[in-house]
Amino acid sequence: MKIVSFILILVSLLLFACNDDAKDENSRLDNQLNTKAAELASQFLIIDTHIDVPYRLEDNWEDISEKTEKGHFDYPRAKSGGLNAAFMSIYIPAKYEETGGGKDLADRLINLVEDIVAKNPDKFKIALSTEDVRKNFDNGIISFPLGMENGTPIEGQINNVKYFYDRGIRYITLAHSKSNHLSDSSYDEDKHWNGLSKFGEIVVREMNRLGIIVDVSHLSDSSFYDVLKVSAAPVIASHSSCRFFTEGWERNMNDEMIKKLAEYGGIIMINFGSSFIDNEFRLKREDWKKQLKEWEETHKLQDNDTRTQEYINQHSEKYMQKAVNVSQVVDHIDHVVNLVGIDYVGFGSDFDGVTDTPIGLEDVSKYPNIIYELLKRNYTDEEIEKICSGNLLRVWKEVEDVSNRIQLNED
């Protein structure tokens, strides 16, 4: 009996030792992956096609050349995360389609970005081309290409497309949360055009001619397919994710749309917002927004009433308990790769636009965490570089080439 007990104790000790060895080995491998992820983030050019810094700063100014208290983007965090090119979103709320003034707001936001660059020439530079992005990367400067979120500032004047090209805009999201004079919106139940308007088609062709990327994020499904019929160049979804994980939500792209996007040479840039990534989180968030609206209406509160913020602080947690993490964001990247291949996906975080960032992707310092997750899933260095920037640069260069061919044929 004593011998049996001794043997059992010995076996237990050996098992504990093996478990400890396995844990040590896993920890060692994990550390290696983290180290490599950080190295690749500093080595590769990383592009994010949608960061809402301008609108964030217009009413709540902070110096993003230094560490800021608020927001997701500033220079120190961008450098820490390896972000080299951040498309500054010139975001125009949907209400300006009705009220007017969208063009003026776009000008103010572009001016704001230009002022930041002028005051910090050693840190930031506006990028007008793929060549600019590569040159700035080589010089250690963060590129600010400009994308206009909402075509409302075109204001029915085709010459305004050229106007915004000259101001530095290199992609235009045709609509936002409401249908406008160019296109129907995915969020809007009142579809005006059943796709693109006739003027929207003219605008897409003019964007092709000038070398402005057409962005299909926020568009209705019908509008997306209309864009593919009209555009002579590949298009992007600058900040969308996969509807496969958020069933029935038109703001994300379904599998057939992603296949068509890839067939036409385009790319989907994955949005990091938790509502875009996880359906349970999205539905809870919708319930919370409904509850908040009902509470405001019951108490007859005006916009920006301080009592609303107090209510949010007191009650939001119980509605928003589910946490989304960086691994789930990479699930979306995986889904696109498995569906259409490695060449059609990238980063479109929506930082400073979304508030519900995942654990491990809290701000622009966290891109190495995505690379770490990709390494864990056996993505090669070459594949990771394509996701970080290569795919987007390919599409942008093709848009530039299409523009050159069109203008050459005009001469």
What are these regions (language model features)?
Residues 234-240:
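Short hydrophobic/aromatic-enriched beta-strand-loop microsegments
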Residues 18-194, 243, 247-411:
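N-terminal hydrophobic targeting/anchoring segments and the immediately downstream early-domain regions
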Residues 202-216, 220-226, 256-263:
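Substrate-binding cleft of carbohydrate-active enzyme catalytic domains
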Residues 1-4:
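Positively charged n-region of N-terminal signal peptides that target proteins for export
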Residues 7-14:
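Bacterial N-terminal signal peptides
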Residues 194-202:
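Active-site glycine-rich loop that binds ribose-phosphate moieties when present
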Residues 157-161, 223-232:
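Distinct, well-ordered alpha-helical segments
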